Design a protein with these regions (language model features):
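Bacterial N-terminal signal peptides
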Residues: 7-16
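Sec/Tat signal peptide C-region and signal peptidase I cleavage site
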Residues: 17-21
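Positively charged n-region of N-terminal signal peptides that target proteins for export
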Residues: 1-4
């Protein structure tokens, strides 16, 4: 759990530092625990953990969209992906984000892990539709399924993604 908190703090600290270029007064919380001096080469030693938004049920899968200069993250129970930018703050990016059916699916219908692939598309782990999907950032209607079966059985609940430098993606 400590590693998760450390990684979350790292990401929030890094992105928070990027945000200060546009806006200089976000509330702060906690502190960054530097377990390795190498971190100083990645994150400025004066960086703080800044709160960019509140009121989310369960935030997951943050990914920085370098080309657009914004952050995407999932709110899994609310079935939505939010977008944060220094210019506009928080706005809704995609709803539904993981369950596109009708009726109630579960308490975890939305997307979870997110990455930007080598083509610049958003790839999402979708609990509700039990798949890994890809879509152009500016054309969500072109979302397509990349994987939904393993050995002939539907995926249970894809959770997170990582991508190798070759572009190969792996999920758990």
């Amino acid at each position: 759990m400590k590693k998760l908190i450390t990684m979350t703090s790292l990401l929030v600290g890094f992105l928070g530092n990027m945000a200060t270029a546009q806006q200089s007064s976000f509330p702060t919380i906690g502190k960054i625990h530097r377990l390795d001096p190498g971190l100083d080469h990645l994150i400025d030693t004066t960086s703080k953990i800044e709160i960019l938004g509140t009121g989310y049920t369960w935030s997951e899968g943050p990914v920085w969209v370098k080309k657009g200069g914004y952050l995407l993250f999932s709110d899994v129970p609310e079935n939505v992906i939010h977008k944060w930018s220094a210019a506009k703050g928080i706005e809704e990016f995609l709803r539904p984000s993981g369950y596109t059916g009708t009726g109630t699916y579960s308490e975890e219908p939305g997307s979870n892990g997110l990455i930007i692939n080598k083509k610049g598309n958003l790839v999402s782990c979708e609990h509700g539709d039990r798949r890994i999907a890809e879509m152009p950032l500016d054309k969500p209607e072109q979302k397509k399924t990349l994987a939904h079966l393993f050995e002939g059985k539907k995926l249970n609940s894809p959770n997170d993604l990582v991508q190798k430098s070759s572009g190969d993606a792996f999920s758990q």
